[in-house]
């Protein structure tokens, strides 16, 4: 626009000069004789003009343009423009290039967003792998060869993704480089774990598989004259040599009152006349871990699993988790005392309430880690039992066989095992089995007392548990299972017996 303005100003100046010169010349011709020489003509130039050269033209410079009038009075103007005109075509190309670059930037930016999301996803997977590897480091027995293969496969997938990101990503790759280093470290760690295998778990398992194969071959080729392995004892029978092992726990259900009710007991009612009866009872204590106020009955295990078809009852006099059911009766330690109460499961009425002679109560000699269980009631194939301690026994376990109808004591045995050092106990075929805590995940059946022979001794049967504390253990003679109340969860264990009956001494 500035060049156009300059051109117009120059043109106006030239036209103005020419018109004034013409008027002046005409006026001079009217008043005087026209000059015959260039010198005379020069006298009539406009004010501010320069002298005209003889026989030629005189230029009048103004800014960056010049104007002149020749000898005939004709105005001539010249305007000095830049060497090149305004580059409109180059500006248009620049705008087009900028548009193309903007589109490319948008595409690359969208890729960056996708990469960021992918990095976030794989970062979470990497954290998950880290946790799994840490678990494998802490508990080497829990992992398998398949675990290694799955982890290595996932790490390889992440390595491929990182390489793809580095190939396609333009700009700073600092985050991707860090992720690649972490994945490389994870790969080395998994390979190190697999190669070290500190407990030789994988090699041992391979050897076990090989041994099992050989064992099957031996069994297939052995003579038919070899007598078969004797079957397990019949339900409710004592034709065996005692407990020699125990299965892994089966989690049946959380107690019906919820996770906060960590203390209590549960089991299956046993009746020698009707051993197949499937009446299950659950008796969680109140949150004070002392008072037994409510219990629930289920007619089958299926109903217990889905909390269906149950009967709820309320009592106000139970104490501790030493409860047991026998012959359609519930036996409990009476609240704040040394009595035992017999409650009819059909009517919820107390039929008998009788003191257990000399029994300590109210946490005098309770189990380790469990309060208010000074008196623990138990059932086996033979009778109803009371497991407790007295001042006369100096806290050692006392076993009494009870009349399940009158609650009178029939026989009593005093052991050498201190009751507060025991975490819990149960009876099988007249033999007391006591447990102790090894750690937060393991109990041990470490002690037994046989009332049939009055012999006692040590055992080493490990017993896994789901939670830290075991509150009660009840044995059922017909299904030969332990019913364990473990921090609010209802667990089942199968007992394994020695096939050869124990010889009396």
Swiss-Prot record:
An MF annotation (GO) of this entry: cadherin binding
GO biological process, one term: negative regulation of canonical NF-kappaB signal transduction
Signal peptide (UniProt feature, chain positions): 1-18
Organism domain of life: Eukaryota
Compartment(s) of residence: Secreted, Extracellular space; Mitochondrion
Pfam families according to UniProt: OLF
Keyword Ligase: no
InterPro entries with a match to the protein in the record: Olfac-like_dom, Olfactomedin-like_domain
PROSITE patterns reported for this sequence: OLF
Function recorded in the entry: May promote proliferation of pancreatic cancer cells by favoring the transition from the S to G2/M phase. In myeloid leukemic cell lines, inhibits cell growth and induces cell differentiation and apoptosis. May play a role in the inhibition of EIF4EBP1 phosphorylation/deactivation. Facilitates cell adhesion, most probably through interaction with cell surface lectins and cadherin.
Domain notes: The olfactomedin-like domain is involved in the interaction with cadherin.
PANTHER family to which the protein is assigned, alphabetical: OLFACTOMEDIN-4 (PTHR23192:SF7), OLFACTOMEDIN-RELATED (PTHR23192)
Name of the protein in its database record: Olfactomedin-4
Originating organism: Mus musculus
Lineage: Eukaryota, Metazoa, Chordata, Craniata, Vertebrata
Gene symbol of the encoding locus: Olfm4
């Amino acid at each position: 626009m500035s060049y156009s303005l300059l051109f117009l100003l120059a043109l106006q100046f030239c036209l103005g000069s020419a018109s004034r010169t013409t008027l002046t010349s005409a006026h001079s011709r009217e008043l005087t004789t026209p000059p015959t020489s260039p010198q005379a003509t020069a006298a009539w130039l406009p004010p501010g003009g320069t002298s005209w050269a003889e026989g030629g033209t005189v230029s009048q410079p103004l800014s960056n343009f010049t104007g002149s009038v020749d000898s005939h009075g004709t105005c001539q103007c010249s305007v000095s423009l830049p060497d090149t005109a305004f580059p409109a075509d180059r500006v248009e190309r620049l705008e087009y290039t900028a548009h193309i670059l903007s589109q490319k930037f948008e595409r690359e930016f969208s890729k960056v967003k996708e990469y960021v999301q992918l990095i976030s996803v794989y970062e979470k997977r990497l954290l998950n792998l880290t946790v799994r590897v840490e678990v494998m480091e802490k508990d080497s027995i829990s992992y398998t060869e398949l675990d290694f293969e799955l982890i290595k496969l996932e790490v390889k997938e992440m390595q491929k993704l990182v390489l793809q990101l580095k190939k396609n990503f333009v700009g700073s790759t600092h985050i991707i480089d860090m992720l690649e280093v972490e994945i490389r470290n994870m790969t080395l760690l998994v390979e190190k774990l697999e190669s070290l295998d500190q407990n030789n778990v994988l090699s041992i398992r391979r050897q076990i598989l090989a041994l099992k194969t050989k064992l099957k071959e031996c069994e297939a080729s052995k003579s038919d004259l070899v007598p078969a392995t004797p079957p397990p004892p019949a339900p409710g029978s004592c034709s065996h040599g005692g407990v020699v092992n125990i299965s892994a726990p089966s989690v049946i259900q959380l107690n019906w009152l919820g996770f906060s009710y960590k203390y209590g007991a549960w089991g299956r009612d046993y009746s020698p006349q009707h051993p197949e009866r499937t009446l299950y009872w659950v008796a969680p204590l109140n949150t004070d871990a002392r008072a037994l106020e409510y219990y629930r009955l289920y007619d089958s295990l299926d109903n217990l699993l889905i909390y269906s078809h149950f009967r709820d009852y309320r009592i106000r006099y139970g104490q501790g988790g030493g409860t047991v059911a026998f012959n359609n009766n519930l036996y409990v330690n009476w609240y704040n005392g040394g009595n035992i109460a017999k409650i009819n499961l059909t009517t919820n009425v107390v039929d008998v309430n009788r003191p257990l002679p000399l029994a300590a109560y109210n946490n005098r000699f309770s189990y380790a880690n469990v309060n208010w269980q000074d008196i623990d009631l138990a059932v086996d194939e033979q009778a109803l039992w009371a497991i407790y301690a007295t001042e006369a026994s100096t806290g050692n376990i006392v076993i009494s066989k009870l009349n399940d109808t009158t609650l009178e004591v029939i026989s009593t045995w005093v052991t050498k095992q201190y009751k507060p050092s025991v975490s819990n106990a149960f009876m099988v075929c007249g033999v007391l089995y006591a447990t102790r805590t090894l750690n937060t995940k393991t109990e041990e059946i470490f002690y037994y007392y046989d009332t049939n022979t009055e012999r006692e001794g040590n055992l080493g049967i490990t017993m896994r548990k789901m939670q830290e504390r075991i509150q009660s253990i009840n044995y059922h003679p017909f299904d030969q299972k332990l019913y364990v109340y473990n921090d609010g969860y209802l667990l089942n264990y199968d007992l394994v017996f020695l096939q050869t009956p124990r010889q009396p001494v």
